[in-house]
Regions:
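Non-catalytic, solvent-exposed segments at the cell envelope interface
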Residues: 2-6, 10-234
């Protein structure tokens, strides 16, 4: 948990003071005790968006199994900063079961409204939207990003070994995305992706395809990200 606090300092000193505090206190509490509310200094105003990202095994089956959850924290003002923080799985297997039990999709594989509300509540974050990608979709995106090898599992992680594997594969992929965005090569990556084929068979969202493409265009028009980090709390 101490390592997690140190890693969160990256976010705290980059303007995400309130978010970092909430993630540390709500998602990975040091102990089960009542918290003392502390007044925090108001950070400099900034433009920020938060998206929650889900990885499942297969969107073509009746009940896709949850593999991983990440939160994407993006600030475009006063500076362009991007963070991917792992929320699930953790090394606390009991907590993993609790988080997994909240995940639920509708018949057309959209995240249920109750699940979305509960994830907002337990992580204490206001999400601007969500994305769900299955293993096939992730492998396709990894190929477009020139990730040579990505080891995936087909069921929810139930052991520390599978947790480590999921975290490693997620970090490999998202670190490559960070490299592309930080170097200004994001447009080249996104232009290679056949989104009309990927969505909705292997990639779904509460955003329409037009909305999603608009987000991509917005990112590509903005300056290169000064900071892009992948964080796995421990």
């Amino acid at each position: 948990m101490k390592k997690f606090t140190v890693l969160l300092a990256v976010i705290l000193f980059s303007g995400f003071i309130l978010i970092g505090f909430k993630l540390a206190a709500r998602v990975f509490p040091l102990r089960q005790a009542s918290r003392t509310e502390t007044s925090l200094p108001s950070p400099e105003p900034y433009e920020q968006s938060n998206f929650i990202l889900f990885q499942v095994n297969d969107l073509q089956i009746k009940n896709p199994q949850l593999i991983a959850i990440w939160v994407n924290l993006k600030s475009t003002s006063p500076s362009s900063e991007l963070f991917f923080v792992s929320l699930y799985p953790t090394t606390d297997l009991e907590k993993n079961d609790q988080i997994k039990s909240i995940f639920s999709l509708t018949r057309d594989h959209q995240l249920t409204a109750s699940s979305f509300r509960r994830f907002k509540r337990i992580f204490d974050l206001a999400f601007d939207g969500y994305f769900v990608v299955d293993n096939s979709g992730l492998l396709s995106l990894a190929s477009n990003a020139s990730v040579e090898q990505l080891e995936l599992i087909s069921d929810s992680p139930l052991s520390l070994e599978s947790v480590a594997l999921v975290q490693k594969s997620g970090k490999v992929f998202l670190s490559k995305i960070c490299d592309l965005l930080s170097s200004g090569a994001g447009n080249s990556f996104f232009s290679q992706v056949d989104w009309t084929t990927l969505m909705p068979a292997h990639f779904i969202s509460n955003k329409t395809l037009d909305d999603f493409q608009g987000l991509i265009v917005q990112d590509n028009l903005s300056s290169e990200y000064k900071t892009c980090n992948v964080i796995i709390p421990e």
